[in-house]
Amino acid sequence: MDSLKSGLATAGKFTYKGTKTVAKAGYNTSKKHMHKKDKDTHHTDHHEEDEYSEDYHTPRSVNTLRDPSSFPPPPTRSGQAGHVAGNTAGSIAGNYSGYSQPTAAANNTISYNAQAQNTPYSSPAQQQPVSPQPPVQNSQYNPTQNYAIQQPQQPAGTNANYSYGNQQHPAGQAPIVNSITPNHQYNANNTFQSNLPNQQLNVAAPTQSTNNNFNQMAANNTYTNSAQVAYNSQQQQLQQNSQQNTYSNAPYQVQAQAAYNPLPQQQQQQQQQPEYNTQLQQNQQLHNQQAYGQQQQIYSNNTQPQYVSQTQQTSYTQNAPPQQTRSPEQPVYGQGITPPVQANAYRPMPSIPPDVNQTAITSTNSANEALQNRIPMNNVDLSSLPPPPTHRDRGRASVENETIDENMQTNNSTIDSSSVASADINNNSIRNIPAPAVGPPGAATRAVPPPPPRRTTSQSMSTNSVVETSPGINSIEQINNYYDGTYAGHSANERPPITNTLKRGTPPLPRRSTSTKMNTQPNPQTPISPSRDTNMDLQRRSTVSSIQSSNRPMPDPPIRKDNIQENNIESKQVNQEVNSQMSVSNIGIGDITSELQHIKLKSVGNSYEREIHGEAATEVVHNKPLKKKPPTVPKKKDSLKGKAPPPVPKKKPTLTSFVHS
């Protein structure tokens, strides 16, 4: 452990070398631990691990000891990265200049750079920032100018106004003070920052634009009227606005000159509005001291509680260049419109770290609103959302589909077999489950003619007869396919039990004995076709076992042909008898099956003869049972007459052989 500790100690100093030592030390200590585990119990290991974990976690606690207020605030927007450094120097009373500057506007700390330089003018600045400069109408303002430079020139209040028309100082105050104050504030800063005349000139230009905008707003009586309501000195402010009109109309030079004569104008303002300034100073000082522990210009609750959050607004707006915050030609209040309550109140704070200074809000009136503004809450109306699905909803889709199926079945009862087949397919697709072999009542018409390649002659005839005899059965084809292993495209292993198909109160399946009579007619072609009846399959199995055990010689082909013909004749006769007894019109299906019989007999007979003569040599072993079948079939037929259908066969032994042939 000592080596580990030393390695950790050196890791920070030597970087790569230190990490190497740590790795080596860890490797060596792990070796020791491995050897100790063999001898000792795990107590020592746990003890050492605990020590190591303690040492390892202790440095993390050091981070908790640091005061986050010691760090400068991160830049809130991309354009302000340069300003952060200045903010740290100018931060007042431990407030980050970036944060305090909303209040910093009162502090004359320039909206971007809170500079101590502005502080001597803090009292006039506090008075002055009341004039919200309408968002600098960018007509004269150059976006390229650095805010870091310009705004330090402007007292914070003016900068807040200048950078953001958003910051809406109390309505009456703002317009008038704006017209004069931008000059005064610039003047105050200029006098203080006389070393920056050029920059001041640059700043003056935006003031002109702001003044022009402001004058426009003043021309709109709505803006000035609100100001009048708010302040007694409105008329003076209007006069000042008219004065500013001269300035604003004048070229930059005039304003610059005015800026260099800051004190007299500021004094004029103070004289013109002594009441307002005194109230602002007192209220602002109280609020600033309470909330921020600083004197920062906060718009007094008395004058306009609405705009108490202007400091907040300034905090939003000061942190970003004015162009970003507002499009030009949008005065903070909208041109000629009474300032909305807390225009910036609903903007989310971008990325300002939480600070006690910010949570403390300037006025009790806007405290709740300000908190809501600073903490963006995404309120989701859960009532608008649909209720979550429950287990009860699981079967609803299938239940609805069942009703659909019943409707389709009733409609299909009058439709021919081809349309019924398509409807049956549609029903199955709707349910997304394999169609049961037996359907609900009224589905007898669903019986689909068996696919020609899958059905032997006797089977197709028998299925037709059975379908008409039992009106409640969904489709005998499905039942036969079930026994064949071709049920609904599923493999033999996936077949659903046929008992499920009898659930809906349908009449029971017809006794299989009648079909066994028909199907058990020794039809030698059936074993060859890939799909075959169950009885024939059992016969084939029995013959396979008997033939393989005795290895009897194969019968001659002519005997087999005779048997084939005889068996076919018998099966035809039986099927015709059954159909005549049922007296059911089976014309279309009967015609098709009769044609299929002839086609199938030829193809099956040819393939069978080829295999007998050994043309398919590889298949001889598999086909032996088939060859020996015809003589044995009649015996098995008698034994199977009265018996119930045997269980479903799981394998089709002869199917693979015919794939090759």
UniProtKB/Swiss-Prot annotation:
Start-end of Polar residues biased regions: 319-328, 356-371, 406-419, 458-473, 512-533, 541-552
Ranges for region Disordered: 19-99, 116-142, 154-194, 263-419, 431-473, 487-563, 615-661
Compositionally biased spans, kind Low complexity: 120-142, 263-318, 434-447
This protein's GO CC annotations: actin cortical patch; membrane raft
N-terminal signal peptide: none
GO biological process: barbed-end actin filament capping
Composition-biased stretches (Basic and acidic residues): 37-58, 390-399
Assigned keywords, A-Z: Membrane
Compartment(s) where it occurs, according to its Swiss-Prot or TrEMBL record: Membrane raft
A matching Pfam family: AIM3
Membrane topology, record value: Peripheral membrane protein
InterPro entries: Aim3
Family label: Belongs to the AIM3 family.
Name this protein carries in UniProt: Altered inheritance of mitochondria protein 3-1
Native species: Candida glabrata (strain ATCC 2001 / BCRC 20586 / JCM 3761 / NBRC 0622 / NRRL Y-65 / CBS 138)
